[in-house]
């Protein structure tokens, strides 16, 4: 995903009821580095919700992913590495589900000019791997949004607005209306505001 989309989102914020702090960090398409950084996010910040945003070059719509998979990682990353045995976390469940009901969010989200769909297969690559790790560390308090590449029909401004609406709905879904959000390139953390 292009960082300028998150710049757009940071300009928009998440609305008046939500205190928002935006930061970006691009996660490389690297299994080991993604694992290190995602683990650090959960250990260092203990967020209430992490929303990963990854680009799917074949996507024609924004895709809300319900689950992450533990096995099947056979494609090499940018460093020609893949997890041993194609497994993210040996001994962990095959599938972890998000605590956010993506189907419900998908039904409630309407952004003119952007299709939003629901999926249960995030693709067994670094995005899915990262998502599974977050679901594991956060005990289901994570989400993954796959976005299509930016284009004339989907400029950064429109994608930023769409992500804003989707994340607002996710916050409603988890029932925590007042949060401070920290947005990371390919990972968006939502943390409680101080004093909450």
From Swiss-Prot:
Biological processes annotated in GO: proteolysis
Gene expressing this chain: PGPEP1L
Catalytic residues of the enzyme: 65, 127, 146
Name of the top EC class for this enzyme: hydrolase
The keyword Endoplasmic reticulum belongs to this UniProt entry's keyword annotation: no
Extent of the signal sequence: none
Record-stated family: Belongs to the peptidase C15 family.
EC number(s) reported in the record: 3.4.19.-
One Pfam match: Peptidase_C15
Keywords tagged on the record: Hydrolase, Protease, Thiol protease
Protein name: Pyroglutamyl-peptidase 1-like protein
Domain of life of the native organism: Eukaryota
Taxonomic source organism: Homo sapiens (Human)
GO molecular function: cysteine-type peptidase activity
Keyword Glycoprotein: no
């Amino acid at each position: 995903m292009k960082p300028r989309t998150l710049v757009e989102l940071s300009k928009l914020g998440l609305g008046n009821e939500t205190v928002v702090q935006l930061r970006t960090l691009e996660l490389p398409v690297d299994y080991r580095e993604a694992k290190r950084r995602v683990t650090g996010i959960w250990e260092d910040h203990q967020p209430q919700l992490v929303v990963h945003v990854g680009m799917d070059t074949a996507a024609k719509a924004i895709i809300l992913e319900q689950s992450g998979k533990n096995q099947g990682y056979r494609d090499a990353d940018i460093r020609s590495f893949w997890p041993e045995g194609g497994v993210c976390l040996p001994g962990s469940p095959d599938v972890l589900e998000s605590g956010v009901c993506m189907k419900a969010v998908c039904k409630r989200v309407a952004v003119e000019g952007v299709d939003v769909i629901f999926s249960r297969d995030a693709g067994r690559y670094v995005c899915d791997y990262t998502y599974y790790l977050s679901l594991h560390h956060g005990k289901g308090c994570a989400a993954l949004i796959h976005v299509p590449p930016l284009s004339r029909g989907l400029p950064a401004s429109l994608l930023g607005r769409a992500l804003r609406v989707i994340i607002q709905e996710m916050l409603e879904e988890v029932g925590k209306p007042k949060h401070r959000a920290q947005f990371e390139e390919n990972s968006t953390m939502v943390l409680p505001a101080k004093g909450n």
